[in-house]
């Protein structure tokens, strides 16, 4: 009987020749061509595996650049970098590494936690504001220039006494006189017009 052949350890083949690929309208094929140029010597299985991983992580603008045949300025990661990145574990925070993407369900849970925290903070802030006593305010606070009602009463009174003035001149003159009136005189125009008595200025 012949001797049994032992199993040989598998070694990835090294390709010494590289064909020149054409640039196509397919962005993924152009990306694969660029990946093959950068990491020449990979087996077809490894090239497809790691190139497909990085393609899924590219943004739409980066994918569009490969489709429009623009010169690539994207930093591609070698298979060794991917393996090292996947082996890293964030012990401190228990978060995923920067090379791995969160699943849609994980992103949804994280956004729900953030929204619930923000709602809790808003409710606590509102409760604190409700607990503070509000300063007592008068029902009708008047500024030192008087209220709008008082100014309108004064403007009507002034218009009746100066019918010859144009609208622009009437407003300018009335405003100037209103600002010069003492506060007690301005306060008198809070009452109806037939009660106010004003002399010609």
From Swiss-Prot:
Keyword terms of this UniProt record: Chromosome, Differentiation, DNA condensation, DNA-binding, Nucleus, Spermatogenesis
Where is this chain's protein located in or outside the cell?
Nucleus; Chromosome
Indicate, by first and last residue, each region the UniProt record lists as having compositional bias (Polar residues).
94-104
Q: Does the keyword Nucleus apply?
A: yes
Give the molecular function GO annotations: DNA binding
Q: Name one GO cellular component term.
A: nucleus
Question: Which InterPro entries does its entry note?
Answer: HMG_box_dom_sf, Protamine-like
> Which phenotype arises from disrupting this gene?
RNAi-mediated knockdown in late spermatogonia to early spermatocytes affects spermiogenesis and results in reduced male fertility. Sperm nuclei are long and needle-shaped due to the elongation of their chromatin region. No effect on the replacement of histones by protamines in the chromatin of sperm during the haploid phase of spermatogenesis.
Asked whether the UniProt record includes Protein biosynthesis among its keywords, one would answer no
Chain intervals with Basic residues compositional bias: 125-143
- Region named Disordered: 93-143
Question: Can you tell which superkingdom this protein's organism belongs to?
Answer: Eukaryota
Annotated family: Belongs to the UPF0771 family.
Q: What does this protein do?
A: Regulates chromatin compaction in spermatid nuclei and is essential for male fertility. Functions in parallel with other chromatin-condensing proteins such as ProtA, ProtB and Mst77F.
Q: What is known of its domains?
A: The C-terminal part (169-201) is essential for male fertility and correct chromatin compaction in mature sperm.
- What's the protein here called? Protamine-like protein 99C
Please tell me the species this chain comes from. Answer: Drosophila melanogaster
